[in-house]
Amino acid sequence: MPTETQLFDTAELFKVLGDSTRIRIINLLSEDEFCVADIAARLNMTQSAISHQLRLLKAARLVKSRRVGQQIFYSFYDTHISDIIRTAIIHIAED
């Protein structure tokens, strides 16, 4: 049985996932790793808006980053999050 702390942390995770922009970013990162400029271009958003959302996702340990020269590339922290999103999309798509 989960502890109170685990239940609280799970609720916090779902709060972070409760934003359509962050879900769109996560969905994109399920394909590959991307830098902020590429994410912004693909989602038709500003780089500052994407950076803000990525900070929240990184703080929640949903994405990680790596620096290559002056660019920072973002990817999934681990595969658990893509499994959660995939399961949610399947659930929504059910008749």
What name fits each language-model region?
Residues 1-9, 78-95:
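Amphipathic alpha-helical dimerization/coiled-coil segments
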Residues 8-48, 72-79:
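N-terminal helix-turn-helix DNA-binding core of bacterial DNA-binding proteins
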Residues 33-34, 58, 89-92:
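Residue-level detector of secondary-structure transition/capping positions
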Residues 41, 52, 58-59:
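Alpha-helical residues within the helix-turn-helix
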Residues 48-49, 54-55, 67:
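Recognition helix of helix-turn-helix DNA-binding domains
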Residues 58-68, 75:
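Beta-hairpin "wing" of winged helix-turn-helix
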